[in-house]
Regions:
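Bacterial N-terminal signal peptides that target proteins for export
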Residues: 1-8
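Flexible loop/hinge segments that line or gate small-molecule binding clefts
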Residues: 26, 30-72, 91-102, 220-228, ...
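Hydrophobic alpha-helical
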Residues: 27-33, 37, 122, 144-225, ...
Length: 402
């Protein structure tokens, strides 16, 4: 997101007009191509270069991308690791006493915006960044551990792709960690993963060294025991509950007829007419039509603060007309979406009077979602979680059909 112009969400906004195409007023006549469309979690982009697919996010005036600030996420994970090292005893971290902090890096998906940002953030923090997120392009660096300078070496990095072609694959992570443990032994001082699921797979791998610091990303419910017991050192929350609420607010606002900046400020920077307001700050990037939430580092000391009673109890029931939303989930086995995001969607949707129909994919083939992306006239809005980030046009093409 570096090149995109940032537009801060401010308390007061000048535009509060109603659209003549509000969902409420035109359910029977509105063309699907004019309805609200939100891409979320997986930004439409080139999977190789990461370049934004602007034609997708600007498909109509009611199209947006909702997600986390990827760059901030990578920086947050990197800083979390630095903070841990600076407050640790170097002799305890450097397991073989060679003066080198060696680490292995589990990459989720080389072409995914979030994965690339996390890889970059970690390498920059550990001074191994060599202007690339590719697995084998890095350099040696230095880092402060407990007041002493140590050399840093990325012993191995690998994109975790399963035999079936699925990315962010836990089975691949488990097998890779087993191989690395056998190959590098006590040279491994840290395990760093682009997500929690792969981090947990490493901990469960054969002969995994007890007490080895492990860092993940997502703060899934499945890592609670690992975090609170110290098996896992740290993770990063994408403030998922707020993301889910934000998606529903975007839908609600557009279907209630709000235009322009009112779409992403009503309920965000200020409360709606019921006093409902998201507690987490969001930033809107005008050049990419993206609404992004910041990230927070999590360890055993602050897990309860961020994860217990995660739902916003201040959100009250609205009296607006009922809205029907079709929402896709790219992978029915994805922990982040199924443990965190979807439960929040299911919690808030009734409060905002939104009926949500969820379709699930297999994480590999776009057709697994696209084949269920049907009966489109029935719905007032759509939320798409792409299987492949360069396939947004397949959905907009269907919405364009007469």
């Amino acid at each position: 997101m570096k090149s995109f112009k940032k537009v801060a969400i401010i308390i007061f906004t000048l535009t509060f007009g109603l659209s003549i195409f509000s969902c409420k007023e035109n359910k029977s006549t509105m063309l699907n191509q004019n309805k609200p469309l939100i891409f979320y979690n997986r930004q439409p982009s080139d999977p190789v270069t990461g370049k934004l697919d602007f034609s997708a996010v600007s498909w109509n005036s009611r199209t947006y991308y909702l997600g986390t600030d990827s760059q901030n996420g990578g920086e947050t994970q990197g800083q979390m690791i630095l903070d841990f090292l600076q407050n640790s005893n170097g002799e305890e971290i450097d397991r073989n006493g060679d003066g080198i902090i060696g680490y292995v890096l589990l990459i989720g998906d080389e072409g995914h915006t979030d994965s690339k940002a996390r890889t970059e953030g970690v390498r920059k923090a550990l001074d191994t960044w060599n202007n690339s997120t590719k697995p084998n392009i890095k350099k040696e660096g230095t880092v402060n551990v407990g007041g002493k300078t140590y050399k840093t070496v990325e012993l191995a990095a690998k994109s975790m792709t399963g035999a079936d072609g699925s990315t962010w694959n836990a089975a691949a992570a488990r097998e890779s960690m087993k191989i690395w443990t056998n190959s590098f032994g006590k040279s491994i001082d840290l395990v760093i993963s682009n997500n929690d699921e792969m981090a947990l797979a490493c901990i469960a791998s054969e002969n995994f060294p007890k007490g080895l610091p492990v860092f993940g990303f997502d703060a899934n419910a499945s890592v609670e025991k690992a975090i609170t017991s110290g098996l896992m050192t740290g993770t990063v929350t994408q403030n998922t509950d707020s993301q889910a609420l934000a998606l529903l607010f975007l839908v609600r606002n557009m279907c209630d007829g709000f235009l322009d900046s009112a779409v992403y400020t009503q309920g965000f920077s200020h409360g709606d007419k019921y006093g409902n307001k998201i507690s987490t700050p969001f930033v809107y990037y005008n050049d990419s039509r993206s609404l992004l939430v910041s990230n927070t580092a999590i360890n055993k000391d602050n897990w309860n603060e961020y994860m217990q009673n995660a739902h916003n109890s201040q959100i009250s029931k609205v009296q607006s007309s009922r809205v029907k939303l079709l929402l896709s989930v790219y992978n029915s086995n994805n922990d982040f979406l199924n443990q965190n995001f979807i439960p929040s969607i299911n919690y808030y949707a009734p409060l905002l009077n939104i009926d949500v129909t969820i379709i699930y994919g297999d994480g590999q083939n776009e057709s697994s979602c696209l084949s269920k992306f049907t009966n489109l006239d029935y719905y007032d809005a759509y939320a798409i979680n792409l299987v492949k980030t360069n396939n947004a046009h397949l959905y907009t093409n269907k919405l364009n059909e007469k």
